[in-house]
Structures are given as structure tokens and as C-alpha cells.
A protein has these predicted regions:
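Short catalytic/metal-binding and nucleic-acid-binding patches
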Residues: 1-280
Length: 280
């Protein structure tokens, strides 16, 4: 067994191939964690991703073929595959996730005609690149450009690193955040609630403002092997380079790359091994 990742039987996950095949039949051309649809004729005014009318069928298929939380995980608050009206989410103990969450105005309603067509792109890889390019243009207030605000958010993200979860990588961009995180015994949705709640309170104080700081929805992708882990870490840490802010990831002041040693390890990984899980 690969020591870096728990086996599928340990996570109680069924092989995903059948689920993905079902997904292709139910939801053609929109098959990844960025799944969003915008074909409804009367969409409400909003800044975030539009409502996804086919989402419930997709989640039902994923639950049938891929994962259902056991009683113990359910008691801890893990939901397995679930949705909150816009995007599919996966939540289980002892897994690694790639997560992206945004400032509230990263997709401003005033420019909806520009960003909405990006969500209809049928090619998964191309859609991700287009969405990332949109975010990297820095729409909205971009409060994370301010060093004091970025420092507060990063402090909150790292506060429980190694105790409640383990961060494998992170990058704060002007209007969004990328994380690669080992989820242990606290549901990802609870971690996001914690991170967003604490950081928004501190950020709003510094900005002398009130109101919503973060977009409610987020994007998450389950990472199931070492190859995908390395790819996710590289993607997150290279985002400032791709956006043209720096020439080397280690030059970016609000990311994990600057903490890596000559073996590319973060401080929390130097004593923890390649993959660690909470006891139990």
C-alpha cells in the first residue's frame, strides 16, 4: 500500500470509474469540480456561480457509485457527496483536497455577461484555464492585495495546521485562495466555515468595513494519488508566476512555496512524513 495515501478501502470509497461514467451520461460536457450551468432563462442577480439545475441528479449518482459516509463519519458531520445549490462537494475523513475559495466580488454581477459564458465551456481543462485567467485579472476590490489583510488571512489558515488538518500548499491571490489540505477528523465544510469566519472578521476590522467578505460557495477536488498531489501543489504555488506577479513561486509573500526547504518540504512536513492522519 502506498504510505502516502490511505487505500480506497480505508476511506471506504468505491472505485470512481462507474460514477464518472454515470456523470458523463447525466451531465455531459461538465464533469469536474467546477461544474456549473447557466441555461436557466431567469437567473437571479448574484455575484457568485449561477444555480445548477442538474446538480441533484449528479450528486445522487455520485452517492450511489462512489461514496456514502458510514455512521461514524456521519456523526462527525461528514456528508460525502453533497451540494448547496450551485456546485458538487465531497466531504470525508482522511482525504486530501484541492480547494479554491473567492472573495465575494470576484465574479462581479456588473460583468456577468463576460464571465458567465466561461462556465459553459465544454472542455474541462480549457474551462479551468479560462476561469483561472478571469480570476487572475483581479476583478473586484481584491482586498487580499493589502499586505495587512493577506497576513491576517494567512495567519488564520495556518493557526491549526498540524493539529486539526495539514496544509500541503496554499497561495493567496488578490481575489481568491488556493489550498491543498489533508482533511482529518473535521469536515472540510467546517474548516472552511472556521477559516472564512475568523479571517473575515479580522479583515473587515482592518478594512473598516462591514458585510460579506467571502463568496459562500467554493471549489473542491479530491486528490487520490501522489501524481495528482504534486500537480495540485504545483498548480497552487505557481499561480502568482502564471499571473505575472513574480518570476519564482518562492518570491510570492503569501504562499507556501517560500517556506519550502532544499527537499521541497514545508516545516510541518519535516517531522510528519509524506502523509499523516489524525489518530483513529
Amino acid at each position: 500500500m502506498n504510505a502516502a495515501f490511505p487505500s480506497p478501502s480505508e476511506r471506504r470509497l468505491q472505485p470512481a470509474a462507474a460514477c464518472f461514467e454515470m456523470e458523463r451520461r447525466i451531465y455531459p460536457a461538465e464533469q469536474d469540480s467546477w461544474i456549473m450551468r447557466t441555461t436557466e432563462p431567469s437567473l437571479p442577480e448574484q455575484t457568485g456561480p449561477p444555480h445548477n439545475p442538474g446538480l441533484k441528479r449528479l450528486i445522487e449518482a455520485k452517492r450511489e457509485w462512489h461514496h456514502r459516509p458510514d455512521a461514524e463519519a456521519g456523526e462527525q458531520g461528514f456528508l460525502g457527496w453533497h451540494e448547496r445549490g450551485y456546485l458538487p462537494h465531497f466531504d470525508a475523513p482522511n482525504v486530501t483536497q484541492f480547494v479554491t475559495f473567492l472573495l465575494r466580488d470576484a465574479f462581479p454581477v456588473t460583468r456577468r455577461r463576460e464571465w458567465e459564458p466561461l462556465l459553459r465551456e465544454g472542455n474541462e481543462s480549457l474551462r479551468k484555464r479560462k476561469l483561472e485567467a478571469w480570476l487572475d485579472r483581479g476583478h473586484g476590490e481584491c482586498w487580499l492585495r493589502r499586505p495587512d489583510v493577506a497576513a491576517q488571512v494567512e495567519h488564520v489558515l495556518r493557526a491549526e495546521d498540524g493539529r486539526t488538518y495539514r496544509l500541503r500548499a496554499w497561495t493567496l491571490m488578490p481575489n481568491h485562495v488556493h489550498l491543498v489540505v489533508d482533511v482529518w477528523q473535521t469536515p472540510l465544510s467546517s474548516l472552511l466555515h472556521l477559516w472564512k469566519g475568523r479571517s473575515s472578521r479580522e479583515a473587515n476590522k482592518g478594512l473598516k468595513r462591514r458585510g460579506t467578505f467571502w463568496e459562500r460557495e467554493y471549489f473542491d477536488t479530491l486528490i487520490e494519488d501522489e501524481v495528482r498531489l504534486r500537480r495540485a501543489v504545483r498548480y497552487a504555488e505557481n499561480n502568482p508566476v502564471k499571473a505575472g506577479f513574480v518570476c519564482d513561486p518562492k518570491q510570492w509573500l503569501w504562499g507556501s512555496a517560500r517556506f519550502r526547504d532544499e527537499y521541497e518540504r514545508l516545516p510541518s512536513e519535516r517531522t510528519a512524513g509524506t502523509f499523516t492522519r489524525a489518530a483513529g
